């Protein structure tokens, strides 16, 4: 006898499926069924690939940090490919190289669109629950991460979209299948907003510039369709963005410091010796610390960074020179030498300006080969 615990509509009042096509394959978004305590959640279905995407934010800003604490996690589960972990304990291992790189690919286009002044912890998680080799879980995860962040109440200037582009027999292919990727002369990932390209990652086999440009343009056309799809969902389910607490340097104070000490910073930084430059900046920062006792150590570090950045930028744009006096087309003095160490197979040192890098080379014995 079948037992009915209630219809889906009764159990999940806000459950809804949104559908579109992505590169000729069905793309579905399920919302309102899972992870109700997160700021936003969605199950992304691209072909038979399923990726659970969630975003959460801490209610209060983290103290003692001078950066936006964003954490992007792309998690691969072996069960998604029908496999069981091979370890003795049958547990999932640490993230692989592909998972780490995918987390970075998603992080890069999303991070700049968050408010720089926000200090609340934000965690975006993408969990691959089912894998279809022909439907990229990385792209599904990127779109899902963008979608849930846009729908959530977390301040963010998105959304973004992303696609992969291949080149098979001279033809541009969006989100190529597994077989197409094997013979493709181009492995390109593009992320963009509605107006601008924000991230490109590419590997290619001698692809000319015109072909690469056409591939990027084709990607952006498809991405615009994705963003329109996301915007329709946001218009229906989007939450009002919260007002976050600004923690850190008061910009009115910084502008006052900038107006008073700009010439001092220019004079201190006008040298090609980093040690001399750092020593000249110390008394200036001591004066600022005495004049503004309410500034924390983190605030003072930020003042120093922002002032130096402003001076370097103005020199580049207004005078065409760099901080060490070099022109835009000049490079630092280079030096290289080899044979520094007697008991290794190879060694050397490469120096550029005041930055030396040493290196060693060893050839392992045949008995130490990885089988």
Predicted regions, residues:
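Glycine- and acidic-rich phosphate- and metal-coordinating loops
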Residues: 86-88, 107, 117-131, 199-201
């Amino acid at each position: 006898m079948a037992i009915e615990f209630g219809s889906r509509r009764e159990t999940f009042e806000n459950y809804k499926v949104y559908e579109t096509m992505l590169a000729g394959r069905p793309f579905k978004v399920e919302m309102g069924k899972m992870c109700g305590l997160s700021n936003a959640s969605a199950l992304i279905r691209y072909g038979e690939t399923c990726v659970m995407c969630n975003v959460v934010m801490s209610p209060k800003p983290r103290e003692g940090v001078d950066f936006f604490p964003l954490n992007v996690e792309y998690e691969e589960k072996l069960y998604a490919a029908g496999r069981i972990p091979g370890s003795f304990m049958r547990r999932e291992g640490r993230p692989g190289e592909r998972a780490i790189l995918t987390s970075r690919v998603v992080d890069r286009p999303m991070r700049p669109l968050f408010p720089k002044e926000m200090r609340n912890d934000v965690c975006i998680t993408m969990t691959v629950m089912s894998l279809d080799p022909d439907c990229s879980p990385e792209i599904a995860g990127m779109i899902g991460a963008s979608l849930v962040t846009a729908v959530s109440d977390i301040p963010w200037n998105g959304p973004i979209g992303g696609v992969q582009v291949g080149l098979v027999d001279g033809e541009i292919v969006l989100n190529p299948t597994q077989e197409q990727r094997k013979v493709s002369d181009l492995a390109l990932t593009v992320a963009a907003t509605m107006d601008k390209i924000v991230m490109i990652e590419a590997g290619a086999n001698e692809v000319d510039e015109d072909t690469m440009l056409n591939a990027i343009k084709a990607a952006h056309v498809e991405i615009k369709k994705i963003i329109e799809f996301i915007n329709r969902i946001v218009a229906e389910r989007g939450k009002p963005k919260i007002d976050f607490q600004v923690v850190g340097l008061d910009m009115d104070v910084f502008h006052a410091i900038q107006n008073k000490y700009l010439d001092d910073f220019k004079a201190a930084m006008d040298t090609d010796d980093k040690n001399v430059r750092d020593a000249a900046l110390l008394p200036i920062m001591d004066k600022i610390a005495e004049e503004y006792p309410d500034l924390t150590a983190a605030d003072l570090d930020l003042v120093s960074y922002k002032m130096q950045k402003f001076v370097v930028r103005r020199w580049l744009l207004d005078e065409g020179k760099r901080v060490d006096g070099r022109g835009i087309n000049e490079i630092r003095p280079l030096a290289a030498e080899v044979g520094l160490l007697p008991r290794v197979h190879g060694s050397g040192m490469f120096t550029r300006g005041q930055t030396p890098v040493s290196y060693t080379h060893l050839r392992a014995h045949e008995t130490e080969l990885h089988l």
